[in-house]
Amino acid sequence: MAGRFGYEIGDYKFVPEEFLPATVCDKIVGARVSDPGLIRRIARARKRRPALTRDGKLTILSVDHPARMVTRVGDNPLAMGDRYELLARVSRVLTDSRFDGFMATADVVEELLILDYMVQRAGGPSFLGEKVILGCMNRGGLAGVSFEMDDTMTGYTARAINDMGLDGAKLMFRLEPGSCESGKTIMYCVNAINELVDL
């Protein structure tokens, strides 16, 4: 029997409600509205690693697909479009010590920071402490649209990554030989790298 997302691992089936209360999204929105400065304080206070990698390797969970309209998982075209399930699955994965961290756009990073803060306030352990967090920068190349290869910097800026105390940035470049838009994206990435280096 296929799960809601159209796949299962053996007999295992992830049930979000068994891991994370279904009311969590409302609480995250409430925290954003009632205390706009909370996210920055949480981010700046987060315990970071003394070194990026412990063994020369990194296992990073990618959570930036929905930002460019990629939401399909298995036979469900909108699986990653369900924010509650996305947060439940990502936070569950990040509790595993074999994962070093994640990459995401600002909306997801901020919601995970708030969720981690709420878990700690409730007496639980941090699932983001000493995890590597990478801010995704260019998500403007929306999947399937005419300007997909013109992948503009619609995510984090270099300054925002630095201000939030993130551990690094993620850029994506796809070479499409028949598209001059790829050439523009090369320069977007070069400029972003230079800005990051200058910080």
Give the positions of each predicted feature:
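Proline-centered loop/turn at the N-terminus of a beta-strand
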Residues: 58, 130-134, 199
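A contiguous, surface-oriented mixed alpha/beta subdomain in the mid-to-C-terminal portion of proteins
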Residues: 180-181, 195-199
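Active-site beta->alpha loop and helix N-cap motifs at the rims of alpha/beta catalytic domains
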Residues: 65-68, 77-190
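Short glycine-/small-residue-rich flexible loop motifs, especially phosphate/cofactor-binding loops
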Residues: 49, 158, 194
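An N-cap/entry alpha-helix motif that binds or orients negatively charged groups
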Residues: 2-51, 67-117
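Conserved, mostly hydrophobic/aromatic
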Residues: 61
